[in-house]
Amino acid sequence: MSLIRTILKLVVVVGFLSLTVQFIRHWMANKQYVFTKEEVAKLAKQYAGQDHEQAFSKVVVELRRRYPGHILPDEDLQWVFVNAGGWMGSMCLLHASLTEYVLLFGTAVDTGGHSGRYWAEISDTIISGTFRQWKEGTTKSETYYPGDTIVHSAGEATSVQWSSGTWMVEYGRGFIPSTLGFALADTMFSTQDFLTLFYTARVYVKGMILEASTFLTESGVL
């Protein structure tokens, strides 16, 4: 009887998880999104090759003009270290929701490692430096330069390498909470830099609050 109960519980759990995944997939396939990867890439490409700090300032100004209420204010912008997959970089989150994010990303030192495998599509447009990618199932790598956009498809895994001084604009679309395990695992279990963990969680929550506030305002609730 104990074995039967265990099997029944397992069936219920698997069934519940399957329904949850199907619901999320249906929701993501039919919801309206704020950004498109083409729009973000086109905007970033205008400033490729420029000094990255000046380029980022222009990108932020233009994003705020095009998407009012969806980009964090200056007082909430913060460069935060990211340790994941063996590499180390820094990000500045501009927008965050359950299904989208926009951020500035890069590194001041040579670094590389595993890309991670996500339930999300991620695209990066290079402003400065070089990015090298070795895709799963291939025997050769490709190198990308300022103005290039690299698309990391959902479920894909690659080896990644950035040269020092590589900076880019990144847009992600998918079930964003599913990416946090990879993004935070090294911080939690390797570097144990819990201050960085706090900074990361805080800015993501701020992005979620801003998005919720904008949604309620546009819906006429606030």
From Swiss-Prot:
<feature type="site" description="Important for ligand binding">
    <location>
        <position position="124"/>
    </location>
</feature>
<keyword id="KW-0812">Transmembrane</keyword>
<dbReference type="GO" id="GO:0005783">
    <property type="term" value="C:endoplasmic reticulum"/>
</dbReference>
<dbReference type="GO" id="GO:0043457">
    <property type="term" value="P:regulation of cellular respiration"/>
</dbReference>
<keyword id="KW-1133">Transmembrane helix</keyword>
<keyword id="KW-0256">Endoplasmic reticulum</keyword>
<keyword id="KW-0813">Transport</keyword>
<keyword id="KW-0968">Cytoplasmic vesicle</keyword>
<keyword id="KW-0539">Nucleus</keyword>
<feature type="site" description="Important for ligand binding">
    <location>
        <position position="170"/>
    </location>
</feature>
<dbReference type="GO" id="GO:0036269">
    <property type="term" value="P:swimming behavior"/>
</dbReference>
<feature type="transmembrane region" description="Helical">
    <location>
        <begin position="7"/>
        <end position="29"/>
    </location>
</feature>
<feature type="topological domain" description="Lumenal">
    <location>
        <begin position="1"/>
        <end position="6"/>
    </location>
</feature>
<dbReference type="GO" id="GO:0016020">
    <property type="term" value="C:membrane"/>
</dbReference>
<dbReference type="GO" id="GO:0005637">
    <property type="term" value="C:nuclear inner membrane"/>
</dbReference>
<comment type="subunit">
    <text>Homotrimer.</text>
</comment>
<feature type="region of interest" description="C-terminal hydrophobic region">
    <location>
        <begin position="175"/>
        <end position="222"/>
    </location>
</feature>
<dbReference type="InterPro" id="IPR006716">
    <property type="entry name" value="ERG2_sigma1_rcpt-like"/>
</dbReference>
<dbReference type="Pfam" id="PF04622">
    <property type="entry name" value="ERG2_Sigma1R"/>
</dbReference>
<dbReference type="GO" id="GO:1905897">
    <property type="term" value="P:regulation of response to endoplasmic reticulum stress"/>
</dbReference>
<comment type="function">
    <text>May function in lipid transport from the endoplasmic reticulum and be involved in a wide array of cellular functions probably through regulation of the biogenesis of lipid microdomains at the plasma membrane. May regulate calcium efflux at the endoplasmic reticulum.</text>
</comment>
<keyword id="KW-0675">Receptor</keyword>
<keyword id="KW-0472">Membrane</keyword>
<dbReference type="GO" id="GO:0005640">
    <property type="term" value="C:nuclear outer membrane"/>
</dbReference>
<dbReference type="GO" id="GO:0005789">
    <property type="term" value="C:endoplasmic reticulum membrane"/>
</dbReference>
<dbReference type="GO" id="GO:0006869">
    <property type="term" value="P:lipid transport"/>
</dbReference>
<dbReference type="GO" id="GO:0046548">
    <property type="term" value="P:retinal rod cell development"/>
</dbReference>
<comment type="similarity">
    <text>Belongs to the ERG2 family.</text>
</comment>
<feature type="region of interest" description="Important for ligand-binding">
    <location>
        <begin position="97"/>
        <end position="104"/>
    </location>
</feature>
<dbReference type="GO" id="GO:0031410">
    <property type="term" value="C:cytoplasmic vesicle"/>
</dbReference>
<keyword id="KW-0445">Lipid transport</keyword>
<protein>
    <recommendedName>
        <fullName>Sigma non-opioid intracellular receptor 1</fullName>
    </recommendedName>
</protein>
<dbReference type="GO" id="GO:0009611">
    <property type="term" value="P:response to wounding"/>
</dbReference>
<feature type="topological domain" description="Cytoplasmic">
    <location>
        <begin position="30"/>
        <end position="222"/>
    </location>
</feature>
